[in-house]
């Protein structure tokens, strides 16, 4: 008999979760997920080892090409304040009163969907000097930020919209200054084209002039109506937070939409793109691969190990052979996204050596697909992943991200300890099969214009 403990047994295909039986002891006090209303969930996680607590609300909604720029600016405007604290000065003062609590608002991607998030982190009620009810204060701020924005005559404050539109314009212009980021985004634009996964997270520079207080309010209303809402609480009274959340939702008409299904771009003949920039000292190479829409993509655990072996660690093939042995690049890494079926390899090389680096990268990938993989290199690469999972328990934000990632992928919730079990169970054949599923699709090269190359070096310019 194990007190206060529930048994959960999940059965899944071998390919997805590495094991036929997933057996997990899940203590109620450590992790519990409840549905409060259609499309509204709350997940409570233990934070016993921390003196701080955290409340986060995630709104996952379908991305729209027509309103992508409004959504990007909206996140910036919401972070400035809400009805009870209508400007940044009042909001900063209120957070300072709560022993220096931290508030953040962010817009991110979940495959073809978008996620608007607001989080607040501060000390627990136990440590309040005067016995204040900090949980209610935190919930009031983070929910106020999302559900009670500061409005002027029913629309967003024109001055706040003007300021944050200019801020977003500067952010988009700055993309070109980071050539690595610029190359990756240019490659993704060619790769995804007009597909839903290709909608720009930061919006479009030419459409910022169309952002108005009224258009922001229309996008805000659409998000509240269609979003699936997940609240994640750590170290606070879940019941009090849930009660306040439901009261905030009482006056909102809701029609939550299902999550977008995983998608992948179709396999196509390889396309090469080259862009020349005067005076560039380090060329950038971004190579994108697609699974072509497999109905049963590899599990996240398999992809993590596969990317670590290929180019995601200091013991990977690309790092050891392309960077160290052949000295063909300053950096060379790989990453994969299960929801869109894309694998990316990007590197920084000397101008003029892009083709040589590309050939070496493809040779290493081919070697992993069809050549031998030793257990030693698997274990070396796996060791870093296991260490990073151990570190998750040292951060409230990292733990929350771990569990919300599982929610976005439609997986059962399991702790990092079981993630280590799944990672340790990944086999050589599973890594090979995962890499074999990718087909080379797009190569984007940002290099120096002939006759203008700099001296070369590690600088990202």
Predicted feature locations:
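An aromatic/glycine/proline-enriched structural segment found at the starts
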Residues: 197, 201-207, 222-294, 453-461
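A conserved active-site cap/scaffold subdomain adjacent to cofactor or substrate pockets
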Residues: 295, 300-312
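M16 family metallopeptidases and their MPP-like homologs
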Residues: 43-45, 51-71, 88-144, 148, ...
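Short, positively charged and aromatic/hydrophobic N-terminal segments
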Residues: 6, 10-13, 17-27
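N- or domain-start disorder-to-order transition segments that initiate the globular core
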Residues: 27-54
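Short, polar/flexible loop-turn hinges at active-site or ligand-entry regions and domain interfaces
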Residues: 81-84, 126-129, 148-157
């Amino acid at each position: 008999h194990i007190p206060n403990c529930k048994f959960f047994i999940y059965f899944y295909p071998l390919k997805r979760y590495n094991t036929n039986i997933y057996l997990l002891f899940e203590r109620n006090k450590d992790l519990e997920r409840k549905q409060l209303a259609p499309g509204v969930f709350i997940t409570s996680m233990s934070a016993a080892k921390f003196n701080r607590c955290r409340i986060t609300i995630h709104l996952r909604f379908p991305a729209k090409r027509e309103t992508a720029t409004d959504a990007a600016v909206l996140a910036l405007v919401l972070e400035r304040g809400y009805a009870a604290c209508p400007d940044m000065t009042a909001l900063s003062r209120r957070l300072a009163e709560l022993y220096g609590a931290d508030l953040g608002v962010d817009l991110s991607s979940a495959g073809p969907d978008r996620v608007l998030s607001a989080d607040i982190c501060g000390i627990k009620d136990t440590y309040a000097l005067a016995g204040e009810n900090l949980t209610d204060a935190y919930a009031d701020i983070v929910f106020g930020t999302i559900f009670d924005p500061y409005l002027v005559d029913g629309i967003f404050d024109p001055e706040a919209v003007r300021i944050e539109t200019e801020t977003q314009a500067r952010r988009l212009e700055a993309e070109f200054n980071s050539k690595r980021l610029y190359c990756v985004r240019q490659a993704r634009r060619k790769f995804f084209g007009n597909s839903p996964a290709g909608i720009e997270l930061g919006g479009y520079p030419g459409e910022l002039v169309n952002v108005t207080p009224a258009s922001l309010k229309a996008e805000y209303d659409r998000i509240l109506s269609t979003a699936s809402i997940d609240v994640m609480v750590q170290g606070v009274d879940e019941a009090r937070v849930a009660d306040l959340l439901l009261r905030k939702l009482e006056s909102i008409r809701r029609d939550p939409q299902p999550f977008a299904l995983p998608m992948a771009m179709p396999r196509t003949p390889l396309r090469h793109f080259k862009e020349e920039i005067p005076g560039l000292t380090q060329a950038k190479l971004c190579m994108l691969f697609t699974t072509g829409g497999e109905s049963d993509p590899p599990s996240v655990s398999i992809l993590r190990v596969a990317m670590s072996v290929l180019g995601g660690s200091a013991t990977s093939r690309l790092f050891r052979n392309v960077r160290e042995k052949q000295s063909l690049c300053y950096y060379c890494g790989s990453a994969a996204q299960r929801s869109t079926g894309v694998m990316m390899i990007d590197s920084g090389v000397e101008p003029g050596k892009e083709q040589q680096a590309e050939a070496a990268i493809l040779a290493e990938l081919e070697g992993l697909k069809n050549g031998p993989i030793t257990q030693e290199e698997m274990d070396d690469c796996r060791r870093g992943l296991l260490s990073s999972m151990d570190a998750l328990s040292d951060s409230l934000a990292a733990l929350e991200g771990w569990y919300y990632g599982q929610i976005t992928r439609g997986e059962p919730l399991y702790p990092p300890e079981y993630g280590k079990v799944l990672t340790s169970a990944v086999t050589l054949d599973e890594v090979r099969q995962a890499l074999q599923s990718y087909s080379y699709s797009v190569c984007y090269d940002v290099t120096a214009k002939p006759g203008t190359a700099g001296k070369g070096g590690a600088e990202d310019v």
